[in-house]
Each structure stands twice: as C-alpha cells, then as structure tokens.
Amino acid sequence: DGENFVNNTDRFSYFNQLIISRKVTDAFSVQVSPSWSHFNAVEGYVNEDGDIEGKMNNDHFAIAFGGRYKVSNQMAIIVNYDQPLTKHTTNNPEPNISFGIEVSTSAHAFQIFAGNYYSIIPQLNNMYNQNDYREGQFLIGFNITRLWNF
C-alpha cells in the first residue's frame, strides 16, 4: 500500500551478519553470528508533546547461535537461537528458536523444522517476532536446496 510510505526508499530494509563458524568434529559444527538490521521507516506514534516518535528503533542488533550434528552421512539435527540485543520503546521482539532435521541425497538437501518465527526475511524475524516459544507458539518450516557437484 503506497499510502504507508512517503518515499519509495521508506520500503527498504537491510540485514548484515558476520558468520563465525567452526567444524568441531566431523559430525558437530557450531556457529555464532552477530547481526545488524536496519529499516528506513518504522511505525510511529504521537507522544504527549505532540511529536511523532518511532515505536521501535530503525536499527536492531541481535546475536545468533547455531549448531548441526550429523547423525549419519545423510541426516543431521539442526538448531538455531537468535537473541535480540536492542531494546525498543514498545513491542520488543521475542527470541527466535528453531530445531529440525536435515536429510541429504546426492542432489538435494531437505530441511524440516519447527520454529517460532514467521518470515523468510531475517530482519523481520529479528525485529518483529512476537511468537513466544515458551508458550508453544511454533510454526513448521521446510527448505529444499539443490546440491551442485561440478
């Protein structure tokens, strides 16, 4: 809806992440990933002085922890946890958590997992997730990746 944005650039958001990972053993890998999300426009409200303020900051910082344990050559258990670090005026996001299995064939990798976040875009998950995993608010996800062996 064009009425929500003054400029086209107000629609833009950005996500940056530094991925630090380590293959601990042949079967076990871990990852730590600090991230920064930026939204050019955030929802606002009018304060008691009549000024418009953002409900949330335009910038949001988070840190993610992930792990993968290979049960066999074709199957692995995967887990991920994203902890928001930025505190906003209202609507602070809930942490993202997911766990699942990965099955590989010679040409594809299939992942099926349960997580409490809803979007395919990571900056939306990190900044706006209101699903609380402690209350069982999980969704089911599925990924398929084509493996290329050149």
PLM regions and their residue ranges:
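Surface-exposed extracellular loop regions of Gram-negative outer-membrane beta-barrel proteins
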Residues: I63-I78, Q83
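Transmembrane beta-strands of outer-membrane beta-barrel pores
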Residues: D1, W36-N40, Y81-K87, T105-A107, ...
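Membrane-embedded beta-strand positions of outer-membrane beta-barrel proteins
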Residues: N16, V32, G67, V79, ...
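Outer-membrane beta-barrel "beta-signal"
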Residues: F99-H108, I112, Y117-S119, E135-F150
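Residues that define the transmembrane beta-barrel architecture of outer-membrane proteins
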Residues: N8-Y14, N57-I63, P93-I97, S104-S106, ...
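Outer-membrane pore/translocation modules
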Residues: D1-N58, N125-E135
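Active-site/pore-lining binding-face segments in mid-to-C-terminal subdomains
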Residues: A76, N80, P84, N91-S104, ...
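Repeated loop/turn-to-beta-strand initiation elements of outer-membrane beta-barrel proteins
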Residues: A27-V30, N73-V79, A107-Q111, W148-F150
